[in-house]
Regions:
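C-terminal/peripheral segments of proteins
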Residues: 29-698, 713, 726-922
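Secretory targeting and sorting signals
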Residues: 2-29
Length: 922
């Protein structure tokens, strides 16, 4: 088998699959008459009404031509496209008084089935397929199939009904063919180019991935293939109906041509895209090389290498982790052999050759406004977000574990997730699914629930292939032969057609080696041509994770924390998975994690000549995992999973500060308030309190106040510091006083913090990263920005504070004040901080930062020196936005009709609140 350490789960699959595909009931509660197609409310549902969820803005994503006309005339959106927006938004203002009995004001019920009298539509997608779709009062589909195949057919039909155009966008994006779908434009070409550098599969190769599942996974693989094929048939059944019924056809197709039938290969395209965005990690070795070279230029070879290690924080003992006190060593190198390191001569230089980003004339044809809107939305796709709070039975008021969790996938119109409730003799799950995939990826089963946050484990390496000439002559700078294990072998060359530009066919030419896709060419070893290749462990296996997702929804396979972990172990993408049932909570970090030779530096490129090949993959027993932790809870907000589970080469934020600390603090606060026994509402309060907090105000600010205590500051600066102290004492929130307010409470402090944070960072680190202030070269090559602010560079993603310089700044300030630091900066770095005198000059540097921030804020606020009236900083002035509008959550349109912005909250897009007071009989 390709995957190590998983065969122990396969043994139990055959009997379980035989049970679920034979047509008999998976649970005795289905009754003596066999599986029922009726959506009986809470049948085989052990949550007893204590499972809830929300997904703004609404389930319905279909806008037909008549509805568009109505919207343009009256502003009225289609039914159920916005009915979850207000409950989601209003939690920010209602959470302080929240109780279990009022959760229903902010969340929908996630019970199986539909209450009597709440079915608004009943659909029979095909007279030949035994499946029925029931729509509830929020238009959420509850799909009941007589067989697993029938269920999959119904899921395809329902997903097409709610998200057909979005699914079309995703399949073309995942296949690198947006240009042929949305029309020619430079932006389309660029996105196709970038996607083909990640997953350049021909239709035959994509189909081969699916066809290989039975060989790899036996009966479970055969079931997956059957369900994928029937899912596609369900999509096509809807397309057939929509082509003859204008009320079923998304209006976007009047602009881009009628929808074309789906194939199983399209599912691979969507799966690869979603997994590549949310479930990948690593691949930053070339960028790391650029930072290393910069630091060595400033500090010398040895000093630069030491500084690089300091800033990389691969295993900082102060990093907050989800598993506490138990180590899971991964990527801990021994003595690194310098000969294995392959750094380009100029790692900052653009790569040469390879598929061109855009073709000459790509701008000759103006893109459609609708197509451009879609592209702009896709360019702001989020990555690596999501949070989870899971509390064990010992801290639950009723003795049953609690969970408040979900993915942060940004905000789209229609939403990039959809809700569904799926039932067949062998499958029972409700929750969220990525349209184009079919299964419930995040949700609840009969007596358990699960969710995920992106983990970012190191699945991808960058290698340098040494170019050669098979005839022994001169080597071309962009040659397509390379050395591997002593031989000069050819690359595989593939051509991907992608529409036409100015009447000429547009083709993307892709080159592949034994390691992966060629990203381009450069030089190393003093001018020798090399090709840069990304080696991704999940390459050509993008659909394999369906085995794990399928298992999550199969009651015969998932019936306990351990059996759920077994399913999670079959997900190759890198996610932090969290689980809850009536007795247990559990955590498992999935990913097809390569095992590398011990003499390789995992943070830098390696040679592809054959001497540093992967040694297999991390077995399940060595993945981070735990059931019922000693601390009584799990929380995850994309932080480090466990001690010694190394930060991937692309992760620089795993130092002493991470946003998960806001969740930890609030969970512990709820424990203290309620004598260690909390409710679902208490846990929601913990989550929502953190959702409006400013991480910089909670971490950098107290250290800064300590650092400048007793220093003589101007009167205006002292007024600023007083406002900041008051704000910090009240929780450092960025929140409106009421839903109708136009400015933040304590707006002066929010403006001060936003202006001051980058000033403090630069005061400390400019001597190293801006060469004493003469340039910004070091910052330009650093793989992480100062602060991941809510504005997100104009993307308005909602998620914020996911990695930044808070940890570095806290370390430097604590070292300046003599406060203990678990893993301090070494002397080679501290000698460069703040000024020529190193750390000893940080006092005057901080004074200057405070004064510069004060002066900038006076200017931003029209010359006012009355700190209490400030409502702006330099950024809000530059954009012309108020601070709440600057932070606000924006819904990016993936269709014709959008959604309004809402006030900022740093919480999951799709969120579940669950507890199970009972469990099925053993």
């Amino acid at each position: 088998m390709r995957k190590l350490g998983r065969s122990w789960w396969i043994a139990g699959i055959a009997s379980a699959v035989a049970l679920t595909t034979a047509g008999g009931p998976a649970l005795a509660a289905t009754g003596p008459g066999g599986f029922s197609l009726r959506p009986v409310y809470q049948a085989d549902d052990f949550a007893h009404g204590q499972a809830m969820f929300i997904l703004p803005a609404g389930e319905n994503g279909l806008v037909n031509a008549a509805q568009l006309t109505q919207f343009e005339a009256t502003g009225q959106r289609p039914p159920h496209s916005q009915d979850q927006l207000a409950p989601y938004e209003n939690l920010e203002f209602g959470y302080p008084s929240l109780t279990d009995s009022t959760l229903g004001k902010y969340y929908l019920g996630e019970s199986f089935g539909v209450k009597t009298g709440q079915i608004i539509a009943t659909q029979h997608p095909s007279p030949k397929v035994p499946v029925v779709i029931y729509r509830d009062t929020h238009d959420i589909p509850h799909i009941y199939g007589k067989t697993n195949a029938a269920l999959a057919f119904g899921a395809g039909f329902a997903q097409a009904q709610d998200r057909l155009f979005l699914m079309d966008v995703l399949r073309h994006y995942g296949e690198g063919t947006l240009t042929s779908f949305l029309g020619p434009s430079c932006a389309d070409e660029q996105m196709d180019h970038d996607e083909l550098l990640l997953a350049p599969y021909t239709t035959a190769q994509a189909n081969a991935q699916i066809n290989a599942l039975p060989t790899e996974y036996g009966a479970q693989g055969r079931l997956a293939v059957q369900m994928i094929r029937e899912y596609v048939q369900g999509i096509n059944a809807y397309i057939t109906k929509a082509l003859t019924d204008p009320t079923l056809l998304p209006v976007e197709y009047t602009l881009f041509g009628p929808p074309k039938p789906w194939t199983p290969a399209d599912v691979v395209g969507v799966a690869g895209l979603i997994g590549g965005i949310f479930g990948d990690g690593g691949g930053g070795e070339i960028a790391n090389s650029a930072l290393l070279r910069y630091l060595q230029g400033q500090l010398g070879q040895s000093g630069g290498a030491t500084a690089f290690t300091d800033f990389k924080e691969q295993n900082d003992p102060a990093a907050p982790t989800t598993v506490v006190g138990t180590s899971f060593p991964y990527e801990i190198p021994g003595h690194v052999n310098p000969a294995t390191i392959a750094i380009p001569d100029n790692p900052s230089a653009p790569l040469q050759g390879g598929p061109v980003d855009t073709t000459t004339g790509c701008s000759a044809t103006a893109p459609s406004k609708a197509g451009l809107s879609v592209i702009e939305s896709l360019l702001r796709f989020p990555s690596q977000m999501s949070n989870a709070l899971v509390v064990g039975a010992g801290h639950a008021a009723d003795g049953h574990p609690l969970a408040v969790f979900g993915p942060q996938v940004s905000y789209f119109a229609p939403q990039i997730l959809m809700q569904e409730d799926l039932h067949s003799p062998g499958y029972a799950a409700q929750g969220a699914s990525f349209p184009g995939t079919g299964f419930v990826e995040l949700g609840r089963g009969v007596d358990y629930a699960w969710s995920a946050t992106s983990a970012g484990s190191d699945l991808t390496d960058q290698r340098l292939e040494l170019i050669c000439n098979p005839n022994g002559g001169p080597v071309s700078p962009t040659g397509t032969f390379y050395e591997f294990k002593g031989k000069c072998i050819p690359m595989v060359n593939e051509t991907f057609p992608d529409g036409a530009i100015s009447g000429k066919a547009l083709d993307h030419k892709i080159h592949l080696t034994v390691h992966g896709v060629v990203q381009g060419w450069t030089t190393a070893r003093g001018g020798k041509p090399v090709a840069v290749v990304n080696q991704r462990s999940t390459y050509n296996h993008d659909v394999d994770s369906v085995i794990g997702f399928l298992g999550f929804g199969e009651p015969a396979l998932t019936h306990s924390a351990k059996s759920w972990m077994a399913a999670a172990g079959h997900i190759d993408y890198t996610f932090n998975w969290l689980y809850v049932d009536s007795k247990d909570i559990a955590y498992y970090v999935s990913g097809l994690d390569p095992v590398r030779p011990s003499d390789v530096d995992p943070n830098l490129p390696t040679w592809g000549t054959g001497g540093t090949e992967w040694l297999g993959f991390l077995p399940a027993s060595k993945h981070v995992h735990q059931i019922n932790p000693p601390q009584g809870f799990f929380d995850s907000w994309n932080n480090k999973p466990a001690p010694l589970f190394s930060a991937s080469d692309g992760q620089y934020g795993y130092g002493p500060v991470y946003r998960v600390q806001m969740l930890t603090t609030q969970i512990q606060h709820q424990f203290a308030l309620h004598h260690g026994k909390i409710t679902r509402a208490d846990l929601v309060q913990a989550m929502e309190t953190a959702a409006s907090q400013d991480l910089d105000g909670l971490t950098i600010l107290p250290a800064l106040l300590h650092a400048v205590a007793g220093r003589h500051e101007p009167a205006g600066v002292n007024q600023m510091l007083a406002a900041l102290r008051t704000w910090y004492a009240s929780g450092a929130h960025r929140i409106l006083a009421s839903p109708t307010a136009t400015q933040y409470k304590q707006a002066d402090a929010v403006a001060i913090m936003d202006q001051l944070t980058p000033a403090v960072i630069r005061a400390i680190f400019d001597p190293l990263f801006a060469a004493g202030g003469t340039n910004s070269g070091g910052y330009n090559v650093f793989p992480m920005g100062f602060v991941n602010e809510p504005y997100n560079g104009g993307s308005h993603l909602g998620s914020a504070y996911d990695g930044g310089w808070e940890g570095y700044t806290l370390k430097a300030l604590d070292q300046f004040t003599g406060t203990g630091v678990a893993q301090p900066f070494g002397s080679v770095v501290t000698a460069k901080l703040c000024g020529s005198g190193g750390l000893s000059t940080c006092g005057p540097a901080l004074d200057a930062a405070l004064l510069s921030a004060y002066q900038a804020l006076v200017k931003a606020n029209g010359g006012s020196k009355n700190v209490s009236t400030w409502t702006k900083d330099a950024n809000t002035v530059a954009t012309g936005l108020t601070m709440p509008a600057y932070d606000a959550i924006g819904f990016r349109s993936l269709g014709i009709v959008g959604q309004p912005s809402i006030p900022w909250q740093n919480r999951p897009t799709f969120q579940q609140v669950v507890s199970f007071p009972a469990h099925r009989p053993a």
